[in-house]
Amino acid sequence: MSTTRSRAPSTPRDATDRERYLALLRAVNVGGRIVKKDALRDAFARAGGRNVRTFLASGNVLFDAEPGRVHAIVSAACARLQPALGAEPLVMLRTAREIAGLLRRGPFAGVDAPRLLKRYIVFLAGTPRRRPRLPVSNDDEGLDLVFVAKRECWVVSRRKPNGWYGFPVAFVERAVGVEGTARNWSTVTKLANLFSGGPVR
């Protein structure tokens, strides 16, 4: 799968002051909210992100920044994206350590993702306002919320009789009272590999 890279203008700060971040944008390239990967990459680079890299078309941006500047960079990038998207996107920000920690958790243990199942993580914009008793299921949509962490939820999506799979974002937002954005388990593992500099298969 292709990725794109860009470099922002040089800065006098030492590279050791910077940390690698993942920005997960909500509702990008759906419902007419279209932004190309090059434009997404350039928005973060021009906002001050370093070593910017995008992955897939679902709004995944990896970049380096000083911890004290990262929120300003995200805010400036979102302002640049507003004309294309019609509104500034909601962004869920995570560090490499946080993404690696997701892979060490075991909520999907025993869920081998056969052809009739999909696995998702919903990244939340904040801590859950509600902590429902688990699992929470929506049989009409074939969705099961199986685990709620500090800012992530694990969801299994079962194939419906019509052959479609339910998408978990609205389901999770109703359950925990916080907005979020979903990525399937395969994408999460590939993003973790990108963080570590490994290959993406």
Please place each PLM-identified region on the residue numbering.
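Surface-exposed, charge/polar-rich loops and edge strands
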Residues: 5, 14-58, 62-201
